[in-house]
Amino acid sequence: MRTSLIAAGALLALAINVAGARAATPEETSLRDELRRLAERLERVEKRNAALEAQLKTYADRPARSQGEIEARIKALESYNKRLEDALADEGISEREPELASRLKAVEYNTLDIKKQATVIDSIEGFAAGASFTSVGQRATSVDTNGTTLNYRADITVTTPTVKTGDIESKLFGHFRVGQGRGISQNLTSFAGPNVSSFQLGTAIPAENSALLLAQAYYRADIPLPFGGFKPQSREKLTINFGKMDPFAFFDQNAAANDETRQFLASPFVHNALLDNPLAANVGADGFGFSPGVRVAYRNERTKSEPWGLSFAMFGAGRGANFSEGFRSPFWIGQAETTQRFGGLTGNYRAFLWRNGQAPTFLRDPANLDEALLRPHRGGGLNFDQRFGDYITYFGRLGWASGEGLPFDRALALGAEIGGSYWSRGGDALGIAFGANRSSEAFRNTSAQVVDAAGTPVFGFAARGSERVAEVYYRFRVHQNFEISPDFQLIREAAGNPAARPVKVIGIRLQLNQ
């Protein structure tokens, strides 16, 4: 190519010289100028070609010169990979290993930590826990000894996750309780206990000490009916509980008068007075209100807004209530309940029958006059709570019993809980209740003759008529987890004593829950 460019340039110069030997015409002059420009462009192209050839030679020689550098880089990369593999094979982290290995190990450890945390979360998922603290201070008039008392009680509950076995759902429930203070009942002879929230572990434990009690621990299984049917369409259920339980958690419930930590404090307005009272509680539980047993319940929700149910249970009584002996002469109870609506307002109605083969009495055991004589008792009760208006719930309890040594054999309680929305305090409530407990004929005839081992009269009066009880409380909600409740009670003719002065009990309750 370079030779052809030189020949073209020579011919161009020759043509220019020939044209210059004679006088040039204008066309020849223009042609000569054009040829000159072409010659200059050819010269520049030649120089550019020479430069490109030089660069091409340089690039052609470069791989041969850098081959050694590439081999060195490959060896360095192989060495780095070997160090990285060795570092990853060791679980430890060293400052001498490649940074990439350290970072990979750090990511791996963080991932393992996250997995461990997820495992812990999975292991506790489904657990439910609750805690509450209740403290009550009361002052009573017309009592012979100290009329001012203070007590506290703390409750912790835990429910395990639901375990499904086919269509059957089961879980465990645990309840721990601790407290101090026995309340005014220890200084007052009455069919009604002014403070159901009082609790202290054992009479032998000094009052300055406190101990934790496993109050409840039981198993629950819910079985949809019919057994083996299609669960999503089931409207019937069978529930089985067994273990250590509070019988009142399953029987004699009431929406307006059931919780001594938030509602009424006096025992006739918390439970049926014949089953729970300071003198001779027929419920058959231990000294703290709990006993081992088994319960079977049937619930029918074919009419969703008005379900009904039947339940039956057997609990330990006497020494069997505290596991000192087996289920000899236990406490039996059966209950029928239904939910009804009147004018769109919900009401719950219950009827129950019970029998205690070894219930405590007001009589003394001839073998030990300091101990109560145990005798079979039987009875029944009615219970209702009915909404009235938007924020009022009425309640009522009626009880009757028969058997030897009953201090009273009839019990009646009526009252209402009024929601604070009527005075723009939706979280508050006002409770009002009245009750009467009729002394039994046996108690009226023999109460004055009952003495203890030292010959001291246990009651010291001849009973007659009925004990009458009234209570008013106001529950003031400070915030969602804290409530303060001033409380007033009036007891007339306590334990049927016609000579007893009216007992006025003023108190205040603090309630914390979580």
Task: Show which residues each predicted segment covers.
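Repeated loop/turn-to-beta-strand initiation elements of outer-membrane beta-barrel proteins
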Residues: 164-172, 226-227, 303-310, 342-349, ...
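Residue-level signature of outer-membrane beta-barrel architecture
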Residues: 122, 160-164, 221-223, 244, ...
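Outer-membrane beta-barrel pore domains and translocons
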Residues: 134-138, 177-179, 243-247, 299, ...
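Surface-exposed coil loops of outer-membrane beta-barrel proteins
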Residues: 187-218, 226-331, 335, 449-459
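Outer membrane beta-barrel transmembrane domains
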Residues: 337, 350-374, 378-385, 395-397, ...
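N-terminal periplasmic/intermembrane-space "pro-region" immediately following the signal or transit peptide
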Residues: 20-147, 161-168, 232-233
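Outer-membrane beta-barrel "beta-signal"
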Residues: 502-514
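Membrane-embedded beta-strands of outer-membrane beta-barrel proteins
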Residues: 156, 217, 294-296, 334-336, ...
